[in-house]
Amino acid sequence: MLFPKEVHLMRSDKSANKEFLWLALAAALVLLAAILPAEVKSQSQPAIYDPAADMKALISAAVEKAGVENRNILLIFGGNWCPWCHRLHELFTSDPQVKRILAERYLLLLVDVGEKPGQPLNRDLVELYRVKGFGYPALAVLDKQGHLLSAQSTGVLEKGKGHDPAKVLAFLKTQIGS
């Protein structure tokens, strides 16, 4: 025998099973605690999309204004439930370079896609501006006449848990030709 009788490599009593269950429960709670803050934060953020907005009327008004001001229109498809939509909005409102190009060269419209899969909002606009299947947020750039210049998934603009300001800026610049 390799070990003395007093040394036990495994306990076979019920206390070992209880100990294992407590450890498993503790591990599950730690994982849950790590996941919940991000979900709670996204739900507690202020609404940036307006589900009651008449997007067709707003786009029509933006086209008129864009023609006068010689700017493009940036449609940002997403929803208040979407953490990535809030992250992109945060970048648009906080990064000085991105904020400047948006203010100078674009009119922004946030297009709410709805919260319920069976009851989507603005589905016709999602299809018209070719962002169907992209995931959210998705971008569509219109010229000053309202013609679609490009539709873009924002997945390629991501970096870590947010959007890369340099990639977003490069995308916005390519749409205005500078």
Residue ranges and their predicted role:
Residues 134-177:
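Non-catalytic, surface beta->alpha helical segment in thiol-disulfide oxidoreductase systems
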Residues 86-101:
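Typically the conserved alpha-helix immediately C-terminal to a functionally engaged Cys/Sec
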Residues 69-82:
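Short active-site neighborhood of thiol/selenol oxidoreductases, capturing the structured segment around
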Residues 98-121:
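Thiol-based oxidoreductase modules, predominantly thioredoxin-like and allied folds used
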Residues 2-51:
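N-terminal targeting signals for export/organelle localization
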Residues 40-69:
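N-terminal leader/targeting and pre-domain segments
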Residues 72, 123-142:
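Structural micro-motif
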Residues 80-84, 91-92, 113-118, 146-148, ...:
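Solvent-exposed loop/turn segments at secondary-structure junctions
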